Amino acid sequence: MESKRLDNAALAAGISPNYINAHGKPQSISAETKRRLLDAMHQRTATKVAVTPVPNVMVYTSGKKMPMVVEGSGEYSWLLTTEEGTQYKGHVTGGKAFNLPTKLPEGYHTLTLTQDDQRAHCRVIVAPKRCYEPQALLNKQKLWGACVQLYTLRSEKNWGIGDFGDLKAMLVDVAKRGGSFIGLNPIHALYSANPESASPYSPSSRRWLNVIYIDVNAVEDFHLSEEAQAWWQLPTTQQTLQQARDADWVDYSTVTALKMTALRMAWKGFAQRDDEQMTAFRQFVAEQGDSLFWQAAFDALHAQQVKEDEMRWGWPAWPEMYQNVDSPEVRQFCEEHRDDVDFYLWLQWLAYSQFAACWEISQGYEMPIGLYRDLAVGVAEGGAETWCDRELYCLKASVGAPPDILGPLGQNWGLPPMDPHIITARAYEPFIELLRANMQNCGALRIDHVMSMLRLWWIPYGETADQGAYVHYPVDDLLSILALESKRHRCMVIGEDLGTVPVEIVGKLRSSGVYSYKVLYFENDHEKTFRAPKAYPEQSMAVAATHDLPTLRGYWESGDLTLGKTLGLYPDEVVLRGLYQDRELAKQGLLDALHKYGCLPKRAGHKASLMSMTPTLNRGLQRYIADSNSALLGLQPEDWLDMAEPVNIPGTSYQYKNWRRKLSATLESMFADDGVNKLLKDLDRRRRAAAKKK
């Protein structure tokens, strides 16, 4: 009986009883895993929920019937108030259904049911069927852009890391060469007090920006501050800056120290202002509300805690009195350190303003997409977002991926999941706020691990990923809300759908207007025959690689496999040997395809094992995806520069300097290079030709 109750509770909570393992066979989930995941989401038993006449939220598609079932008995009067204030009224009998007005506009409305002195409320969300698509894509244009990790950019003026000033300059250079966008890896808030925690996919908060990307050169108060300018002219400052700029790997600690020193001095001057800039800053703070305030409070408190003990990496390692955002001690800290909190509020305003200026540049050049942002799948355990909202995040679990052939223990990403039951109980407000924050000042949003809208692999805290299970999310409602916010922000959506993709979500994503992600290396069958360019789906973005994959040179030379062997990433020599063999077959299949579809001159070699990476081969590989039927093409500057070194190696932490490798050339020299310019001109021409073939 106990077992049956547990199974029912797990099923009711959305925990799948089994999954298909790496060998294609069903694998049952243990009772212990179910018990611990229920405990993580505070759902130990299938508790009965108090019956209300209507649910707290209902989501509908515009233009379709909108039935509302009313529980209970007796007569109810109902009042529907739209977002704009229009009201509809009526009566309904409990136990029956009625249809909401068919002409309800898209948006967020409120239904109130009244019976005697009892009231019940339901948030009514009416959404379009599909996400927004820019007119250029509706006109069947084939667009291309650069996929960039902002921190990798070198320039003659930055402070050792790519910044929003570099982004602005690169947008101009890409636009002038026919490009339609720059795609960014996540620029979410990380940790100024712990700068070496540099993964953009383990952020402190997904609602705010990484202030390390502030272009200090563009901050007026930095130039107006005599103290800052005296510091700036010191030989030691210039020497440290030049070393950070010249380094091949981002030195986060040094760069952060430089920028924080300069910005602290600039803040002193700004804080004395009584002008339109101060008014704009205060207005920004007021509009962004508690979420922004607590982000700044976290950063200020984190800085103090690290000064006292550098091992206090996040709030779980702080003294207990500071672990609860609502504690009197936290309130007291904010009052006593108001200037520090204001400083971090100002940094967020600077970052927001500079990023908005980049967006304005892209629109000035009439780039059809301009900027596309990246929404990480989760947040880190010890950051601002979990500190501010302990109820929403299940801290006794983390997300990852189930076991596969290469990783028999699976992957544990160390990110606490959002509780689907809390998201629903709050009428989807956390999801809506997240989308709104990340759809600002951009024309596209890439959703990392988009399958998370259907299900996520949850792992009990402290366990390896093979002890996990899939937990389901209300995918249809989430996709509808995604479409509504996409349309409102005029922001198209790209779903990163790599890895294990459940069949049931593929059709949902396509019909919702979410663009898929097609990586050249993966677009082949078991015979290593590569998908023809014209066979790529139109509703997709084609890329050669991603931040988790080798560059073109790295792939062709199997540098990723060699490095993986050195780092001990593979279970045994048999697996590694199989990977090398598989790569050789893939290279031959790819070379055959390049010749077959006219991406290489006929004189080029036909045997992959005898062919090294050359400018001709590099160009041919990029031509292949440029010729694709995909509406979007993402190109990596690493491949323009023929780089071999990867920027990230999945499955590693301390073994490799992830998220630090810079580009091998400055922006100025890269866009002055004849080879790069000829390549981009060729690829731009082929994209235009691909559009005409339609």
Q: Whereabouts are the PLM-identified features?
A:
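Conserved alpha/beta catalytic core and glycan-binding cleft of carbohydrate-active enzymes
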Residues: 280, 284, 409, 497-640
